Every structure is written in C-alpha cells, then in structure tokens.
Amino acid sequence: MAKLSRNALIGYPAGVITGIAYGLNPLFAKPLMNNGAATEAILFFRYAIAVALLGGFLLIKRESFKVNLKQAGVLFILGLPFTASSTFLFEAYKYIASGLATTLVFLFPVMVAIIMVFLKVVPSWPVWLSIGATFIGVAIMTGGNGTDSVDPTGVGFSIASAFVYALFIVLINRNKQIASISNTLLTFYALLVGSIVFLISSLCSGIDMLSGLRGAGSWLNLIGLAILPTIVSTATLAIASRNIGATKASVLGVFEPITAIIVGTLAFGEALTPNILIGILISIVSVTFMIVVTKR
C-alpha cells in the first residue's frame, strides 16, 4: 500500500469535509424557500453573512486584504462560477427533490476530468476508475430517490450547477496568479464577488429582500448556510485542490450526495431505498480505493 504524503494527509480530509458541508445546502435552504423567500435574497444574505464572518476572522488574524490588479481580476472571475453554481442549485430545488438536485451536482468530477484533459493533464487510471465507479453510484442513488417525478428543468439546472462548479475547482488549482493568496483570503474574495452579484440581481429584479426571512428560525438557517455550505466547503475545497489536485478533490465530493440523501431522508421525508444504499456503498468503496492506491 502506498504511503500517503503530507499533501495527501491534508488534502483528502479537506475533500471529505467539503462534500459533507456542501451536502447540507438543502437542510438550510429548503425551509427558507418554503417560506417564500426569493432565491436572490437567500443567496445575498448567505454570502454577505459569510463575508462579514470571514472579514472579521481576517482582521483578528491581522491578515492583509491587499491583492494586486491581476489577482483582483482572477478573484473576480473565480467568484462568478461559484456564484452561478449556487444559483443553479437553488433553482433546481424548485423543480426536483432537494436530495436529488444536490446529488446530480456530483456529476462535476467527470466534468473536471474532461476539462483537465483539455489542459493536457490526464488523470491516472485509478482516478478514472474512481470517477466511473462514483458516477455509477450516483446514478443508482438518483434512480432510487423517492417517488417524485423528475422534471427535466430541475435536472438541467443541477447539471449546469455541476459544470460551473467544475470550472471553479479547475480555476483554483491551475491559476498561478492566486497561488500566494491564503485559502481564507481567497474564500473571502470569492464570496464577496457573489454577494455583490446577488445584491445587484435583487435590486434589479425589485424583489422584497426580507420576504420569507422574518423570524429567528429564518436567520438561523441563513447563518447555517453562511457557515457550513459556504465558508467551510469553499475553504476546504481550496485546501484539497491545492494539496491533492482538482480531479481527486472532486472525486472526494462523493460525500456531498451521501450527505444530501441523508438530509433529504431525515429532514424532508425523502425515501431511503435499497438503490440509494447500494449507491452509497459503491461510492465509498471507490473513494477508498483511490486513496489507498494513489498518492501525490
């Protein structure tokens, strides 16, 4: 068995945390949407709260916010796919079950691998095998997710979310301009771009920003969205991508659909069928295989 390097010991756990944290999206988002809150408003407050928390953390650490002009341009571009991914996922929640929507986003490892091939970085055979196995596992889980009809619009939004999420991962991993920027500062600026985009979108659409967001429960959900699927998942994704590479980091995101299915079952009454259990088992085995036989 190959001995794991220091990068692997840091990157693999970070990748697992990324998947679990991001898979908690529906736990906080669905109650807000069910209360009538607009997608743009939810995402604006989610990102704005996250920016405030991260900004305070950076101030306490006395870390400089300074970036050069080229880095600012890259960070702006980096924030756009992450922003789009959240938008598409939340739109998908309107059409299909939340667990199914979040599970479909896990198509992004295949997209990452394809993008990396175009960048002349061909994954090793264990990684390809893991991608194939996890894709099969997700397909099985999707086929057993409750009794709701599958609306193609929701599927389309989920796939779009997966694609732009893949772009986000590759940008973090491949761009040398931001290599010197700390993970926390990178996350801060990516989320700052998102909060600005959602604020402009909300103002232009003329929506009531506070509609469906009144009451302590709503704000606790927004804080939950800001901390776990936003700050934690984004920061650990950056750590994983930098330590083990974009493709392996994306495969470890298998814990995202697993978490989403569990949340859907326990919180929203979505069925936990034998197909889902088999899919989870296949996915976990494939990730374990990748970790055991590969290292960086």
Segments and roles (model prediction):
Residues 53, 58-59, 108-132, 258-277:
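C-terminal transmembrane-helix exit sites in multi-pass transporters
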Residues 30, 54, 112-113, 118, ...:
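Transmembrane alpha-helical segments that form core, pore/gating elements
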Residues 21, 57-101, 105, 140, ...:
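Specific transmembrane alpha-helical segments of multi-pass solute transporters/efflux pumps
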Residues 1-41, 45, 80, 84, ...:
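Glycine-/small-residue-enriched transmembrane alpha-helix faces in small-molecule transporters
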Residues 2-4, 43, 47, 143, ...:
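C-terminal-most transmembrane helix of multi-pass membrane proteins
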Residues 54, 107, 123-144, 162, ...:
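Hydrophobic transmembrane alpha-helices of multi-pass small-molecule transport proteins
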Residues 7-12, 36-44, 67-72, 143-164, ...:
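Juxtamembrane helix-entry segments on the extracytoplasmic side of multipass membrane proteins
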Residues 19, 45, 100-107, 172-195, ...:
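Helix-helix packing/entry segments at the starts of transmembrane helices
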